[in-house]
């Protein structure tokens, strides 16, 4: 289905004039034809790979640009939003004046005027009560394809009466010449106005700005209604038992929730309301670096016609070298969720979660592969949002870089982190849910915990088998760890066993504990935060 009646005249309301043609809600075949046209140049051009998926490049931006993110500070947002210039914690919510907003808006509308435009109408949020109707406007076919993959695709009847709650205008080709005099970070911008309900994009072609932009908006609207808004994946077992997996990029959200034994609800963004857990999205956005059909068969098989690859290296014969990270380590693929066989249908939602899993990839080798959290520890580790990356291996630099990202998604939070923690804990308590901290990273041997062992741990949590295990307490962090689990080498479960001596582990543990303590200081500006210090590591 192509144009279903949006006229160039109707775009004038957004400030876009002289539109040559509106390609409204194109179907996948039309998008495929448009994005692979021989006449396209530069980053607009898509290449057909051997699987049938189209590959595109996003240019110098191969990830989000958090320093170029702004929100208009006005009556709507002044007292509710978590601003970068308030309180102890640092964040990316930089305030923008109404005047600068107008200037950015006219840059984008000028860029989009006089063009042939793609307009895609979508839903963000699987629950009709709280979903947003979002309209995307772009001049680039593959960007229209990206949002069609990633958001929920309304049926024809809903499209016929579609009225957007929020509009995203993507002007990737335009940049802001006045950024210095306006006191902005660069010529590129991702700007939001919660009063006008518009997102503007300029200078960056990265698809994820549209996906995560809407996540930031949902993260503002839902908790204010008492609905948890979560950076997590989610799945459900045959008995209707729901699990959610929180974690930062690269910790295993997509991989671990895509499980042949369980139905996928979604891989990245969810809400939790009075009915249960629901997906915000209609697609998945998986990392593809070092992807193999052996380790991740479901994701590998999802890469076919209608999937969209980003920044991968395509060989002359159309095959993809997933091991090649020369453009970026953040190579990605977006695909509609139904490319995974085992999903919740027809709507990506299920009941209340009974298991909440925090994924961390601890490159320091200190934390156990799995531990059970008390209610206070749950809030503490949720607010800490710890993971650690191994630095580049050049010149022998292997010192890990710790990342503390509140709620396992600080980059996307628009309210104070404690608001998300409070809503989550309320939902967990009402559902009688348990929380587990799972380390998918390293131990003292310098080897990463294998995916096979992590899956065995997750299976033990989901089956309830882990509840019967004898436990020990890890000192300093005071974490309760099982002594044995089926399918897991017992020695692995206590990180101290992977060190030459307990003292060697303790030295590393003290250093990491200090980082936790220093990081958590920013939450002690509220009585609730101050009270949680007790649940953290103690030196």
From Swiss-Prot:
Q: Which UniProt keywords apply?
A: ATP-binding, Cytoplasm, Decarboxylase, Gluconeogenesis, Lyase, Manganese, Metal-binding, Nucleotide-binding
Per UniProt, what is one Pfam family of this protein? PEPCK_ATP
Q: What class of enzyme is it?
A: lyase
Which domain of life does the protein's organism represent?
Bacteria
Under Enzyme Commission nomenclature, its number is 4.1.1.49
GO (cellular component) term, any one: cytosol
* Cofactor(s) of this protein: Mn(2+)
Its subcellular locations are: Cytoplasm
Sorted alphabetically, which Gene3D superfamilies does this protein's record hold? 3.90.228.20, Phosphoenolpyruvate Carboxykinase, domain 1, Phosphoenolpyruvate Carboxykinase, domain 2
Where is ATP annotated to bind? 212, 231, 247-255, 296, 332, 448-449, 454
UniProt binding sites for Mn(2+): 212, 231, 268
Catalysis: reaction(s)? oxaloacetate + ATP = phosphoenolpyruvate + ADP + CO2
Q: Name one GO biological process term.
A: gluconeogenesis
Give the pathway annotation.
Answer: Carbohydrate biosynthesis; gluconeogenesis
One of the entry's Gene Ontology molecular-function terms is: metal ion binding
What family is this protein classified in? Belongs to the phosphoenolpyruvate carboxykinase (ATP) family.
The subunit structure is:
Monomer.
Q: What does this protein do?
A: Involved in the gluconeogenesis. Catalyzes the conversion of oxaloacetate (OAA) to phosphoenolpyruvate (PEP) through direct phosphoryl transfer between the nucleoside triphosphate and OAA.
Q: Which HAMAP family does this UniProt record tie to the protein?
A: PEPCK_ATP
Protein name per the record: Phosphoenolpyruvate carboxykinase (ATP)
Protein source organism: Erwinia tasmaniensis (strain DSM 17950 / CFBP 7177 / CIP 109463 / NCPPB 4357 / Et1/99)
**Gene encoding this polypeptide?**
pckA
